[in-house]
UniProtKB/Swiss-Prot annotation:
Family assignment from sequence similarity: Belongs to the CRISPR-associated endonuclease Cas12f family.
Effect of Q197A: About 30% cleavage of target dsDNA
Organism encoding this protein: Uncultured archaeon
Region described as Zinc finger domain (ZF): spans on this chain: 1-95
More details: Part of a type V-F CRISPR-Cas system.
Region described as Linker: 313-321
Domain text: Has an asymmetric bilobed structure, with a recognition (REC) lobe and nuclease (NUC) lobe; the sgRNA:target DNA is bound between the 2 lobes. The REC lobe (residues 1-312) is formed by the WED, ZF and REC domains, while the NUC lobe (residues 321-529) is formed by the RuvC and TNB domains. Has a split RuvC-like domain with the nuclease active sites.
Residues binding Zn(2+) 2: C475, C478, C500, C503
Protein name in the entry: CRISPR-associated endodeoxyribonuclease Cas12f1
Amino acid sequence: MAKNTITKTLKLRIVRPYNSAEVEKIVADEKNNREKIALEKNKDKVKEACSKHLKVAAYCTTQVERNACLFCKARKLDDKFYQKLRGQFPDAVFWQEISEIFRQLQKQAAEIYNQSLIELYYEIFIKGKGIANASSVEHYLSDVCYTRAAELFKNAAIASGLRSKIKSNFRLKELKNMKSGLPTTKSDNFPIPLVKQKGGQYTGFEISNHNSDFIIKIPFGRWQVKKEIDKYRPWEKFDFEQVQKSPKPISLLLSTQRRKRNKGWSKDEGTEAEIKKVMNGDYQTSYIEVKRGSKIGEKSAWMLNLSIDVPKIDKGVDPSIIGGIDVGVKSPLVCAINNAFSRYSISDNDLFHFNKKMFARRRILLKKNRHKRAGHGAKNKLKPITILTEKSERFRKKLIERWACEIADFFIKNKVGTVQMENLESMKRKEDSYFNIRLRGFWPYAEMQNKIEFKLKQYGIEIRKVAPNNTSKTCSKCGHLNNYFNFEYRKKNKFPHFKCEKCNFKENADYNAALNISNPKLKSTKEEP
C-alpha cells in the first residue's frame, strides 16, 4: 500500500539556548539598556551606520550587518555579564557552553559511529567470510552499537539515532560486490542524531511557539559545566564533566526572523508554511540532527535538521498514464508520455557548460596559487578554491530545483501518474565508455534524479526505475534495434536525429529514448539498499 506522506527535512539555524522566562527577561532588559546608552552616545552616526536597521525595524541577520550596526554592537553582552548571571541562576545554559557541549557530543558520536562500522565489517567479512544477512546486521546494531552508545551518553535518543545512522549507511550488498567502501566520517562533519523515544521522562522533542519564536526542547541532558577551569588549559573557557543523572533537557531558539520577512511566510504552501505547521503542532517530528554549518561564514554556527512527514498533494493524476524521462548530454532532460504527442525538453545544458567552466577556473586558481598564499596552512591556501566550490554548488542546486519544478508541472498538466526513469547505477562501474566518463565528470546525474524523484513523489506520482539497455538504439515506433546508433556514431555526426533502418522512422534521438523509457512493458529494476 502506497504511503500518503513523504519525508522532508527542514534546516534551521540554532540562535542560542532558551532559558527560563526570568533569565530571558534579564538578558532582554540588559540589551535594551545598552542599546539606549549607545544611541545617546552616537546620535550623529546612527542614521549612517544603521539605516537598514531602522528601516526594517528588526535586528541584523548576517555577521557583516551585525559588525557594521551600532545597535547590534551595543546589544552584544560580554563574558562578565554572563558570569554574574550564571552565579544567580546555576541551571542556566548559554551559547559558549552549548557550543562546547555540541562539539564534545559530535566528537564522541563520530568515534562510536566509525568504531561500530569497522567492527561490523570485521565480524561479517573477516570472521564470517562474507556470510551475513540483514537480520545479523540488525542483531549487531541492537546488541553492540546501541548498548555502547547508551552506556556512554546515558541517552536513549542519541543511541537510537546512531543505530539508525549506521543501519542506513552500512550497505551490505554494495560492500559484498565491492561497489563502495566503508562510509567512515570525520568528527567535524558528523551530525548528532536523535530519535524520539516513547515513554519515560524527557524522551521526546517538545516544540513550542513563544512570541512567534521557534523553540525546541531536546533531551541533551548529560553534561554540566565544572566551576573550576583547568590551569593547564587556559585557552578553554569551559571544562565539562559527565554526570550519571540527567538534568532537564536543553531548550534551543531556532532562527525564523529572516523567513518572516519573506512573502512566503504568509502563504499556505512551501517551506515557510511547513515551518509554521511544525511550530503550531500540525506536523510532528521523530528524528532530528544537530550539525555544524557547512557554508563559508557558518563554520561556527550550529544547524538543526528536522525530519517531518508531509502529506502528499493531490493533483488528480492517473496511474495508468505513464511518462518517461531520458538523461542526455546535449539535452539534459527530455520527457515523453506513452501513446501521446506531448513532450517537454530542456534543450540548453547550462549545468554541463557551467561545470566545465568551473573545472577550468579551478585549474587556473590552483596554478596561480601554487607558489602564493603559502606559509599559513592548507586552509588558507585553498580558500579561493573553497569559495569557488560553494558558489558552483549553490548554482547547481538552484538549477536542478528549477528543472525538477518544470518537469513536475509538465507531468501534472498531462495527468501522468507513473513516471519511469533509467537506473543509472551501472554507470559507476563502466569506465570504458566516453559518455559515462563525460557525464560523471561534469554532471551530477544522481543528484538530479533524486531531486526530480522527490519532487514528483510530493504530488503522488509513482516512480519506477527501468534498465537503460538499448533505449537509445531501439525504434519507438516498430521496436527494431539499430546497433549502428551508438554513442561514437552520434558523437562523430554531432548528435544527429534517430533514424530507423527498418521503418525509416525519424525523430529526435533523446525524445525517441524517452518514448522507449515510457513503455509500460519495460521491467523495473529495484535499487540495492
